[in-house]
Amino acid sequence: MDKKKLYIFLDVDGVLNNTSTFRLNRKTMYVLSHENLVAYQFLIDKSMTKYDVKVILSSTWRMYKTGINKLSKFSKKYNGLVLCGKTPDGVDYREVEIKDFCDNHNINYDDILIIDDELIDNELKKRHLRTNCHEGLRFSDVMNWLEKEGIK
């Protein structure tokens, strides 16, 4: 039996990094936090027990080769960074870009997870795991979402 698909719309800043990461790496905007990456990969690994996980990059990193290359480099260690797509480069609010992506690809809103530190305030908000930009994605965020999804 095929697993149900789960499309994860991934933001990077405020999810896979945090304010401490930026303070320690002032030379570049494209930084990742080991702690946040480990929490994210744990979410991916656990989610894959129930779902066929597809990661869509919704971060502004999608618009810059430097950002895409950084994620690609880390994808060798963290398979949760293997991307199957990205939202179109647009000027709309993130939730509008994600909604349009879903509509254009016939993706049911119940089959998505948006991991983002920005507020999602439309019909997608019930599928939003909101992080805190100061801390990024924490294990407590991951555990709460896994429990909500019935994943052990």
Segments the model singles out, each with a brief description of its role:
Residues M1-K152:
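Catalytic phosphate/metal-binding cores of nucleic-acid and nucleotide-processing enzymes, i.e., regions
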